[in-house]
C-alpha cells in the first residue's frame, strides 16, 4: 500500500473535477479524499497499490472534459488507512 499527496493546478474548480476524481478512484479501488483549495488548485490524498495509483494519476492528469490541467505535483506520504474515497469540504 502506497499513499500520495497530489496537487492539481489549472482550471480545476467549477468543472466537476472532484466528482470526476472520486469516480476514477472508486473504479480503481483507490482510497482517500479530494478537496478544493483556496488558491484554486485541487488537493488529493490517494492510497492504493502502485498499479492502481499509477492509473489514477494518469486519469487525474487528464481531468474531466471541462478541466485544463496545467500542473500535477506528487509527493509520497504515509498511508492513513482510509476505507473509501470522499470529497472533503472546508
From Swiss-Prot:
Keywords: Hydrolase. GO terms for molecular function: acylphosphatase activity. The active site is at residues 18, 36. The keyword rRNA-binding does not apply. It catalyses: an acyl phosphate + H2O = a carboxylate + phosphate + H(+). Residues 3-89 form the Acylphosphatase-like domain. Its EC number is 3.6.1.7. Belongs to the acylphosphatase family. This is Acylphosphatase.
Amino acid at each position: 500500500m502506497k499513499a500520495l499527496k497530489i496537487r492539481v493546478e489549472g482550471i480545476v474548480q467549477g468543472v466537476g473535477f472532484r466528482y470526476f476524481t472520486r469516480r476514477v478512484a472508486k473504479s480503481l479501488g483507490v482510497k482517500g479524499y479530494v478537496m478544493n483549495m483556496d488558491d484554486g488548485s485541487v488537493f488529493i490524498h490517494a492510497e492504493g497499490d502502485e498499479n492502481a495509483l499509477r492509473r489514477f494519476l494518469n486519469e487525474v492528469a487528464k481531468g474531466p472534459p471541462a478541466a485544463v490541467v496545467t500542473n500535477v505535483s506528487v509527493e509520497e506520504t504515509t498511508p492513513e488507512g482510509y476505507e473509501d474515497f470522499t470529497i472533503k469540504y472546508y
